[in-house]
Amino acid sequence: MAVPKKRTSRSKKKIRKNVRKGKKHIGPAIKAFSLAKSISTGHSKSFYCIVNDDSSGSSESKLTAFDLDDP
């Protein structure tokens, strides 16, 4: 009878278990929810949006930090 040489690691067991249980597609949803939560609370330091400045007449775009407290 064939015997495995090394013990299977916990992380590999967990990955295989999650694939069997159908939990492999939850990761992107959790990341999206986490990003939305950090933006809504104002704690996001890595989310930027492009703002077009039409008041000056030029078509330049600025990269500014997204802030929900600014009206």
UniProtKB/Swiss-Prot annotation:
Keywords for this protein: Chloroplast, Plastid, Ribonucleoprotein, Ribosomal protein
Family: Belongs to the bacterial ribosomal protein bL32 family.
Region (Disordered): 1-24
InterPro entries reported in the protein's UniProt record: Ribosomal_bL32, Ribosomal_bL32_plant/cyanobact
Main location as per UniProt: plastid
Protein name per its UniProtKB record: Large ribosomal subunit protein bL32c
PANTHER family (alphabetical): 50S RIBOSOMAL PROTEIN L32, CHLOROPLASTIC, LARGE RIBOSOMAL SUBUNIT PROTEIN BL32C
Xref: HAMAP family: Ribosomal_bL32
Gene Ontology molecular function: any one: structural constituent of ribosome
Cellular component GO terms held in the UniProt record: chloroplast; large ribosomal subunit
The species this protein was found in: Pinus koraiensis
Biological processes annotated in GO: translation
UniProt-annotated location(s): Plastid, Chloroplast
